[in-house]
Amino acid sequence: MKNYVKRIRESYRKELNVIEVNDLPLILLTEVINQSILRGATKIKVSFDGAILMVHDNAAPLEDDDIMWRVTCRHEGMMSPERRRMFRILDRQWSSPPYAAVNALCKKFKLIVSKGNRLHSIICNDGIVTSDNIGEVGIGDGNMVIMEPMIEASGTDTTMIGEMMELIQERFPQVTITFRTRV
């Protein structure tokens, strides 16, 4: 675990220019927080229950899919052709229920953004979107992002997520980022 955190820290110090696909959770979380700040957020809350990261902010509500589009485009070049095809397919499936097409493509990684109390956008990469996950969307006020780290369950650890939070807080000193665990 310490080596994993060290690798994340080293990659982060390089401005995220060179980073492995397994480190996507840190990149995506950084991007989400950056987008929250651009929308005027001054307080960001991150919680972790052992498997899922939840991010709340006090920014203005999302009005379109810009945040998801930027995240997709930013990281598409780092993925294999198969994963790029998956993302392009998912681009077309975001607002098209039922979610069977998404479920068929996914196994391990997901990023869900809510807009108010309705499902807003989904990015999945080897992850499964279940009714339980969708049920989490829209809880509380403001915007919420649910992200499941793309790591094995045995490697899911609050210490690692806490390290990520410290790095991200250093990157964004102008906002208050709080971290709590529900493990």
Predicted regions and their residues:
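Short hinge/gating elements
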Residues: S11-E20, S80-R92, D141-T158
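N-terminal assembly/transducer modules of large multi-domain enzymes
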Residues: K2-V5, I37-A41, D49, T130-V183
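Flexible glycine-/small-residue-rich
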Residues: F48, D57-A59, V113-K115, M147-P149
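Flexible ATP-lid and adjacent glycine-rich G1/G2 motifs of the Bergerat
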Residues: A60-I128
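Bergerat-fold GHKL ATPase/HATPase_c domain
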Residues: M1-N34, L38-T42, D65-T72, T158, ...
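ATP-lid-like helix-loop hinge signature
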Residues: I27-L62, T130
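Structural motif
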Residues: K43, I52, K108-K110, M144
